[in-house]
C-alpha cells in the first residue's frame, strides 16, 4: 500500500509479474513520475487534495482491496502529502496524515495483519514538519505492536 505522494512506479514495475502480490498506489496524478507504471490499483488524486477528500478516497480504496485476503500489509508511508511539502502536490495537514496512518494501522487490529512500515518521501520546508510527521507515524505504530 503505497501512500507516498509519488506513484510507486518502481514497486509496480518490479512486482508486475507477481500475481500473489497486490500493489496499490494512491498518489498525486500530476506529480512525478510523469510516465506512470501500472499497479494493480492506481488511485490518482488532484492537486491540492485536502484531508477530507483524501481520507474518503483511502477508505474507499481499503474497502476495494479487501485486506483480509492478504498475509501482511507493506505500508509505504511517505509524509510528502503534507501541505508544506516542497515536492508534493497534495494539501494534507499533520492531523490528516495521522488519520491516514491510523486507518492503515487499524488493518492490523481488524484483520490481525502485520503492517510493515517503509519510510517514504518528505521534503517539507521547514524540514521539522517532515521530522514531526515521521515521529507521529512511528509513535502511532508503537501502539499497535504485538
Question: Each predicted region: which residue ranges?
Answer:
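A general "terminal functional-core" signal
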Residues: 1-146
Amino acid at each position: 500500500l503505497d501512500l507516498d505522494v509519488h506513484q510507486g512506479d518502481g514497486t509496480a514495475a518490479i512486482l508486475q509479474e507477481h500475481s500473489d502480490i497486490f500493489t496499490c498506489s494512491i498518489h498525486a496524478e500530476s506529480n512525478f513520475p510523469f510516465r506512470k507504471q501500472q499497479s494493480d490499483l492506481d488511485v490518482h488524486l488532484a492537486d491540492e487534495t485536502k484531508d477530507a477528500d483524501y481520507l474518503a478516497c483511502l477508505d474507499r480504496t481499503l474497502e476495494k482491496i479487501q485486506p483480509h485476503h492478504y498475509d501482511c500489509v507493506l505500508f509505504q508511508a511517505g509524509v510528502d502529502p503534507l501541505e508544506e511539502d516542497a515536492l508534493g502536490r497534495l494539501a494534507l495537514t499533520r492531523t490528516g496524515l495521522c488519520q491516514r496512518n491510523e486507518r492503515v494501522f487499524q488493518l492490523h487490529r481488524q484483520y490481525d495483519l502485520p503492517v510493515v512500515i517503509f519510510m517514504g518521501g518528505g521534503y517539507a520546508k521547514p524540514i521539522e514538519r517532515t521530522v514531526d510527521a515521521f515521529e507521529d507515524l512511528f509513535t502511532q505504530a508503537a501502539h499497535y505492536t504485538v
